Structures are given as C-alpha cells and as structure tokens.
C-alpha cells in the first residue's frame, strides 16, 4: 500500500497542473496516467490563449508552440465576410496553436520538478472509501494491483470521467444534446492563412462547427465537432468533414497524416463535482466551454483551484461538504454564468437555418467590439437588428 497527501488521476493539463501546485504547496503528491505516454494520442484542436499560460505560471516555449496566431475568423455558411477577432479578444482557444503532446509532457515535467511522483501506464481500477469519504484508489501499476491511500483525490480523467461515476457523482452523466462527437485530421501540403484560426458554421457541421488551426509550414489541424443529436456515427461525421475539405481551395490538394476522434462535453456547469475527499477538474467536471468546445484553459484553472482547496483541507484535516464546497464556489464564480449563457446560445444556434446564421455573421462582421463574448455579440446584433435576436434575448 502507498500513502500520499494528494492522488491525481489523469495526466492531462488539469491533472498535471493540480499535481504541480499540490507539490509546490508541500503536499506529497502522486499523479497517475492510464496510457503509457502522457499527451498521446492527441484528441483536440490544440488552441490556447496566451493569458492562461501567464495565469498558471507556464512560460511559453517553442518546444510546445507550433504557431502563434493573430486571431480567429468565424465564417457563416456562405463563407463571405467573416467575423474577425483579434487574439486578445477571442477567448481561451485563440493565441497559440500547440503541439499538444509536447505541451502535456511539459506540464507533467513541471509537476515532477515540483516534487510530484508520476506513474504512467497505471489506470485507476476503483474507488477506496472509508466512513463516507473517498480515501484513495485501486491502481494497476507494473502488472500489480496497488492500493494508494490519499487524503485527497483529484480526478482529472477527461471526458469519460470514470472515477467520478465510480464514486457516485451523477452530475457527470451527460444528456445527448450535451455531447459533441469530434473528428480531426492533421493535414500537410495545404494553403491556409497561418495568422488566423478559422471556424465554419452551418449545415456543413450540424449542431457544431468545422475548424482549421494552422500549425505553420503548410500544416494544420482540420476538424469537425457535431452534436450526437444530429450525427449518428463517426463515418457520417467523417463524410461531412471530407466534403468540406474537397470544396476548400486551400485544403483539397492536401494530405492527412493523422486522424483522431473523440467525444466532448458541452454542458452547463454541473454540480456537485465534489464529495468528501474528492474533487473533479477539467472535462471530468464538465468544464468545457459549450460554444467553443475548448477545455485546456478551464482544466488548468480548475486544477489550480483543486490544489488550493486540497492544501486548505489537508492542513485543517477538514474534508466536510462545507470545505469541498469552497472548490465548487471557485469553479462557479469563474465559469457558471459564462457557461450558462454559452450553453443556451449553443442550443439556440443549433436550431438556426443557414440563412439566419449568415445574417448573424454579416451583422457582427460590421461591428467594432471592444470585447468578444456571446453577450457582446448579441448586444451588437440587437442594436442594429433586434428582430434577429428576439429568440435569443434571454442571453443578453
């Protein structure tokens, strides 16, 4: 049996950040990753804002940054004039295009340098509970089943959120309309603007969008995310993306060198995400932005919060619902209002015709916005064409 102050389950950005901060706080910390290699396979578009790196004290490094972009462009179905967002206004997914596998390894290395132990190829198999408190996990490590006892467990096991479900947190269960099926190619020999990430809305990606994240030197991540309410299987999703590529002048002559698929949660902030001795972070806690589908930044921030509350709980030997509620309050204060608005917008946008989407994009592309958010965009539309946003007025 092994004993730690903090056990972190999952070696993605949220888990590594939680482990790094917990170790920096002087807590004996173990982070486990079920795969043999942290960061592989890559399962996202790889976009991240510059501000999040600064907030989490992560120094930008060329080893994990493939490209720095000026901003983002959002195209309506007709692909005429796009909405252009400068990177400092464009949210958590615009600024850097990462080499995600190298980024994840870098964060894990920071955790190890801070003093955390790291085990790879070590999946959690079950929850250990004592007197109503989560007290650790059973883990397969080096072909043995090991019991790891911990004063606090931080589950950062991604979309599957297995540990939270095993522990009995029903909030992690998702409705169908809150699940996005995603598929992405890494493409080479393409001709796209390296200064902008591009997003395409409409029936080309039902209940979602297509993205092009340029990585420089004729390479980009080209992917699609669509609600499973509209897409019935991965082949159908692939066909939508292939049709888009065939009709895109800068992509149609390119070649794909990698294909990745996965699921993404796009729900409102859901509670509870704790129980005595357990906190969920990142996608395991359903903290993905419902509009963008981006989650790296939110995983990092929630990992920092979880480590902060772990320190306070362990130092005071208090694992009560009231103590765990401090983490939930931090999460709600940071994400709840924005995610609710973006979730409602996501639901409404999925119902709009291509004609209406084009009208919305045309209206916003004419505006000069000081900040970029769902709220700011809707207010800009309402000022000029209030009838267009009548069905969205509850978001403003």
Swiss-Prot record:
<comment type="pathway">
    <text>Membrane lipid metabolism; glycerophospholipid metabolism.</text>
</comment>
<dbReference type="GO" id="GO:0016020">
    <property type="term" value="C:membrane"/>
</dbReference>
<dbReference type="InterPro" id="IPR036188">
    <property type="entry name" value="FAD/NAD-bd_sf"/>
</dbReference>
<feature type="binding site">
    <location>
        <position position="374"/>
    </location>
    <ligand>
        <name>a 2,3-bis-O-(geranylgeranyl)-sn-glycerol 1-phospholipid</name>
    </ligand>
</feature>
<dbReference type="InterPro" id="IPR054715">
    <property type="entry name" value="GGR_cat"/>
</dbReference>
<feature type="binding site">
    <location>
        <position position="44"/>
    </location>
    <ligand>
        <name>FAD</name>
    </ligand>
</feature>
<dbReference type="InterPro" id="IPR054984">
    <property type="entry name" value="DGGPL_reductase"/>
</dbReference>
<keyword id="KW-0520">NAD</keyword>
<dbReference type="GO" id="GO:0046467">
    <property type="term" value="P:membrane lipid biosynthetic process"/>
</dbReference>
<dbReference type="GO" id="GO:0045550">
    <property type="term" value="F:geranylgeranyl reductase activity"/>
</dbReference>
<dbReference type="Pfam" id="PF12831">
    <property type="entry name" value="FAD_oxidored"/>
</dbReference>
<dbReference type="GO" id="GO:0050660">
    <property type="term" value="F:flavin adenine dinucleotide binding"/>
</dbReference>
<protein>
    <recommendedName>
        <fullName>Digeranylgeranylglycerophospholipid reductase</fullName>
        <ecNumber>1.3.1.101</ecNumber>
    </recommendedName>
</protein>
<keyword id="KW-0285">Flavoprotein</keyword>
<feature type="binding site">
    <location>
        <position position="338"/>
    </location>
    <ligand>
        <name>a 2,3-bis-O-(geranylgeranyl)-sn-glycerol 1-phospholipid</name>
    </ligand>
</feature>
<feature type="binding site">
    <location>
        <position position="33"/>
    </location>
    <ligand>
        <name>FAD</name>
    </ligand>
</feature>
<keyword id="KW-0443">Lipid metabolism</keyword>
<feature type="binding site">
    <location>
        <position position="14"/>
    </location>
    <ligand>
        <name>FAD</name>
    </ligand>
</feature>
<keyword id="KW-0274">FAD</keyword>
<keyword id="KW-0560">Oxidoreductase</keyword>
<feature type="binding site">
    <location>
        <position position="124"/>
    </location>
    <ligand>
        <name>FAD</name>
    </ligand>
</feature>
<dbReference type="InterPro" id="IPR050407">
    <property type="entry name" value="Geranylgeranyl_reductase"/>
</dbReference>
<keyword id="KW-0594">Phospholipid biosynthesis</keyword>
<feature type="binding site">
    <location>
        <position position="296"/>
    </location>
    <ligand>
        <name>FAD</name>
    </ligand>
</feature>
<feature type="binding site">
    <location>
        <position position="162"/>
    </location>
    <ligand>
        <name>FAD</name>
    </ligand>
</feature>
<comment type="similarity">
    <text>Belongs to the geranylgeranyl reductase family. DGGGPL reductase subfamily.</text>
</comment>
<dbReference type="GO" id="GO:0016628">
    <property type="term" value="F:oxidoreductase activity, acting on the CH-CH group of donors, NAD or NADP as acceptor"/>
</dbReference>
<keyword id="KW-0444">Lipid biosynthesis</keyword>
<dbReference type="GO" id="GO:0051287">
    <property type="term" value="F:NAD binding"/>
</dbReference>
<feature type="binding site">
    <location>
        <position position="295"/>
    </location>
    <ligand>
        <name>FAD</name>
    </ligand>
</feature>
<feature type="binding site">
    <location>
        <position position="47"/>
    </location>
    <ligand>
        <name>FAD</name>
    </ligand>
</feature>
<dbReference type="Pfam" id="PF22578">
    <property type="entry name" value="GGR_cat"/>
</dbReference>
<keyword id="KW-0521">NADP</keyword>
<dbReference type="GO" id="GO:0050661">
    <property type="term" value="F:NADP binding"/>
</dbReference>
<keyword id="KW-1208">Phospholipid metabolism</keyword>
<dbReference type="GO" id="GO:0046474">
    <property type="term" value="P:glycerophospholipid biosynthetic process"/>
</dbReference>
<feature type="binding site">
    <location>
        <position position="100"/>
    </location>
    <ligand>
        <name>FAD</name>
    </ligand>
</feature>
<dbReference type="InterPro" id="IPR023590">
    <property type="entry name" value="DGGGPL_reductase"/>
</dbReference>
<dbReference type="InterPro" id="IPR011777">
    <property type="entry name" value="Geranylgeranyl_Rdtase_fam"/>
</dbReference>
<feature type="binding site">
    <location>
        <position position="283"/>
    </location>
    <ligand>
        <name>FAD</name>
    </ligand>
</feature>
<comment type="function">
    <text>Is involved in the reduction of 2,3-digeranylgeranylglycerophospholipids (unsaturated archaeols) into 2,3-diphytanylglycerophospholipids (saturated archaeols) in the biosynthesis of archaeal membrane lipids. Catalyzes the formation of archaetidic acid (2,3-di-O-phytanyl-sn-glyceryl phosphate) from 2,3-di-O-geranylgeranylglyceryl phosphate (DGGGP) via the hydrogenation of each double bond of the isoprenoid chains.</text>
</comment>
<feature type="binding site">
    <location>
        <position position="45"/>
    </location>
    <ligand>
        <name>FAD</name>
    </ligand>
</feature>
């Amino acid at each position: 049996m092994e004993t730690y102050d903090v056990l972190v389950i999952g070696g993605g950005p949220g888990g590594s950040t939680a482990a790094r901060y917990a170790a920096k706080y002087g807590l004996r910390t173990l982070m486990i990753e079920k795969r043999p290699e942290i960061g592989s396979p890559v399962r996202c578009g790889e976009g991240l804002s510059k501000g999040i790196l600064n907030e989490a004290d992560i120094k930008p490094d060329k080893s994990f940054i493939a490209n720095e972009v000026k901003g983002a462009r959002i195209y309506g179905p007709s692909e005429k004039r796009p909405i252009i967002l400068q990177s400092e206004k464009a949210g958590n997914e615009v600024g850097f295009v990462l080499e995600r596998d190298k980024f994840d390894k870098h964060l894990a290395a920071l955790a190890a340098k801070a003093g955390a132990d790291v085990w790879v190829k070590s999946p959690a198999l079950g929850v250990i509970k004592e007197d109503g408190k989560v007290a650790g996990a059973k883990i397969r490590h080096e072909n043995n089943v090991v019991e790891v006892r911990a004063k606090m467990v931080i589950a950062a096991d991604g979309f599957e959120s297995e540990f939270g479900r095993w522990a009995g947190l029903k909030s992690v269960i998702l409705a169908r309309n809150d699940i996005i099926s995603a598929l992405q190619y890494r493409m080479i020999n393409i001709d796209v603007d390296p200064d902008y990430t591009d997003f395409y809305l409409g029936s080309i990606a039902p209940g979602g969008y297509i993205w092009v994240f340029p990585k420089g030197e004729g390479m980009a991540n080209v992917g699609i995310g669509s609600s499973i309410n509209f897409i019935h299987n991965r082949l159908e999703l692939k066909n939508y993306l292939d049709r888009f590529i065939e009709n895109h002048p800068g992509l149609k002559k390119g070649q794909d060198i990698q294909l990745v698929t996965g699921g993404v949660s796009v729900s409102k902030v859901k509670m509870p995400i704790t129980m005595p001795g357990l906190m969920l972070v990142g996608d395991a806690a359903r903290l993905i932005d419902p509009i963008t589908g981006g989650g790296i930044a939110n995983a990092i921030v929630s990992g920092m919060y979880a480590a902060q509350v772990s320190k306070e709980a362990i130092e005071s030997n208090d694992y009560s619902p009231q103590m765990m509620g401090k983490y939930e309050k931090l999460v709600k204060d940071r994400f709840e209002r924005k995610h609710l608005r973006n979730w409602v917008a996501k639901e409404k946008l999925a119902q709009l015709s291509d004609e209406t989407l084009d009208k919305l994009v045309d209206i916003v592309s004419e505006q000069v916005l000081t900040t970029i958010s769902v709220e700011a965009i809707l207010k800009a539309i309402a000022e000029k064409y209030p009838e267009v946003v009548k069905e969205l007025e509850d978001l403003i």
